Amino acid sequence: MFNYEELFQTHKTPFYLYDFGKIKQAFLNYKEAFKGRKSLICYALKANSNLSILSLLAKLESGADCVSIGEIYRALKAGIKPYRIVFSGVGKSEFEIEQTLKLNILFLNVESFMELQTIEKIAQSLGIKARISIRINPNIDAKTHPYISTGLKENKFGVGEKEALEMFLWAKKSAFLEPISVHFHIGSQLLELEPIIEASQKVAKIAKSLIALGIDLRFFDVGGGIGVSYENEETIKLYDYAQRILNALQGLDLTIICEPGRSIVAESGELITQVLYEKKAQNKRFVIVDAGMNDFLRPSLYHAKHAIRVITPSKGRKISPCDVVGPVCESSDTFLKGVHLPELEPGDKLVIEKVGAYGSSMASQYNSRPKLLELALEDQKIRVIRKREALEDLWRLEEGLKGV
């Protein structure tokens, strides 16, 4: 059992704590699942882009799935090789495209004809040939939260089969484009295998047609999205996921690219917070803690439910349902409703579980609240991997006040 009391002697709440052993094992599980085929596991930085986490993954020969030039530079800073980086996203600016081409990453995932032409124009101005992949929208329901579903035709991501074919043929004829991959990503937090099987089969068929037309494909990018069990849901077995994708690619000599994020880091992370007050209103019990929605947005944004446990000794205290809420001035600043917890006192400590993904990476300074301290548990030792922001950091980049 981890000794939290030692942490509290040196670190004030709230803070994030990541178990690096869990991150390492989760990544190695992906490498093992796809070992029967040429593959590249590109960790999705959007889930958690802390440099220490990226450095850990770089040492394991991870690639990177990036959606901004900032993420690309983070990946490079952490030691991930350019030839293992892919650049995705529906809205790449000309500046980002130019910088990316100069960095000579593996390829850019293209999401529209206009973007393709922009890449071609910039590549021509640089006198180079841009390696590209085209993201195909297979019009398949991922059966996940609508905010993170990306594979239906009404979603903003990717292009349909007909337009994809036109884009590939355009790229094939261009002196400044090199189409080397097909790509799809139908959504995040997938808990069912059938949508990914259907998408893999559909896009594999398209890939075979493209190869028959003389397009020299080398990669088959299946995106990411395997879900995590937040509420004891049954999840996809990684081995089954990999095998079904491998089956869909029979007859195709392509390197598989997979872009996991959540399933690599989610279960490694905890948000440790302490009780400020208890109150009752209209016979409802509230436990008010020092972490807020600005620190961890998922419950407010997605109505996500993360288990909460008490780590302060509380034996013998009466247990009753309560809402665990933060100090931010929003009614949505609620971590969990109706959770059964013992009577709590100011200073008691709680742990919000499985927050390693889309926790710190989505944090903000809303209500002028500094971003949190982040700690790593590695080889039985605790170290700081992000300092807590000081109050002065809230306005450090602002200008315009004389004499301040």
Where do the protein language model's features map onto the residues?
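Short acidic, glycine/serine/threonine-rich loops at helix termini
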Residues: 54, 77, 97-102, 119-122, ...
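Conserved, mostly hydrophobic/aromatic
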Residues: 23, 46, 68, 100, ...
